[in-house]
């Protein structure tokens, strides 16, 4: 598993993730890049779940973004529809956290597209820890989005055995 966290604050949207890949109880790799830029660097996305499944979903999502000229919500809904109805895709086990300048979304393997409250996303095994940390920092500090993501990932990595301290963080300017 993993931890992916996204925060939108003060004109910035940031998604960060750890780099640990496990096979059962064994750490296989510690520097996986689970956060990427898509669609001409106008969308950022992170994944939690099986690595091969997630890379497949990244490719499919990028195709949907191209098809819908970068419209994040439309591309997410269309990917979720395909994910729900296609027999091969239904077997993929991953969650995507995606964001552009206007919206932050979670796309699930059940075909759900969720726009979270307060534009805070935290998914994966360390998600609850990162979410609690990010929420506390959002409510009680003036830290920027990147700092909140960094600190939340650090806290999750200290608590969750499936999350490490190797972080990939991407950010975009935000209108929302």
Swiss-Prot record:
Query: What GO molecular function terms would the record report?
Result: metal ion binding; threonine-type endopeptidase activity
Binding sites annotated in the UniProt record for Na(+): 157, 160, 163
Q: What class of enzyme is it?
A: hydrolase
The Enzyme Commission number assigned here is 3.4.25.2
- Write the signal peptide boundaries: none
Q: Which reactions does this protein catalyse?
A: ATP-dependent cleavage of peptide bonds with broad specificity
Q: How is its activity regulated?
A: Allosterically activated by HslU binding.
Q: What is its main location?
A: cytoplasm
- Keywords tagged on the record: Allosteric enzyme, Cytoplasm, Hydrolase, Metal-binding, Protease, Sodium, Threonine protease
Gene Ontology CC: one annotated term = HslUV protease complex
Q: Say which domain of life the source belongs to.
A: Bacteria
- Which terms under GO biological process does the entry name? proteolysis involved in protein catabolic process
InterPro entries in alphabetical order? ATP-dep_Prtase_HsIV_su, Ntn_hydrolases_N, Proteasome_sua/b, Proteasome_suB-type
Q: Which Gene3D superfamilies match?
A: Glutamine Phosphoribosylpyrophosphate, subunit 1, domain 1
| Positions of the catalytic residues | 2
Q: Where in the cell is it found?
A: Cytoplasm
Summarizing the function annotation, the protein's role is: Protease subunit of a proteasome-like degradation complex believed to be a general protein degrading machinery.
Self-association and partners: A double ring-shaped homohexamer of HslV is capped on each side by a ring-shaped HslU homohexamer. The assembly of the HslU/HslV complex is dependent on binding of ATP.
Which family does this protein fall into?
Answer: Belongs to the peptidase T1B family. HslV subfamily.
Q: What is this protein called?
A: ATP-dependent protease subunit HslV
The organism is Pectobacterium atrosepticum (strain SCRI 1043 / ATCC BAA-672) (Erwinia carotovora subsp. atroseptica)
């Amino acid at each position: 598993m993993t931890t992916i966290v996204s925060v939108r604050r003060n004109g910035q949207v940031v998604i960060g993730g750890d780099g640990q890949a496990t096979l059962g109880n064994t750490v296989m790799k510690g520097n996986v890049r689970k956060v990427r830029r898509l669609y001409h660097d106008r969308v950022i996305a992170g994944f939690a779940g099986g690595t091969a499944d997630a890379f497949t979903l990244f490719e499919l999502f990028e195709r949907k973004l191209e098809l819908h000229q970068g419209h994040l919500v439309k591309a997410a809904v269309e990917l979720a529809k395909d994910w729900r109805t296609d027999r091969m895709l239904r077997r993929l086990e991953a969650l995507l956290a995606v964001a552009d300048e206007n919206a932050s979304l979670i796309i699930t393997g059940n075909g759900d597209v969720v726009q979270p409250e307060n534009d805070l996303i935290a998914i994966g095994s360390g998600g609850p820890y990162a979410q609690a940390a990010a929420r506390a920092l959002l409510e009680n500090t003036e830290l920027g989005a990147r700092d909140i993501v960094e600190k939340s990932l650090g806290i999750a990595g200290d608590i969750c055995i499936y999350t490490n301290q190797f972080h990939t963080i991407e950010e975009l300017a935000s209108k929302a």
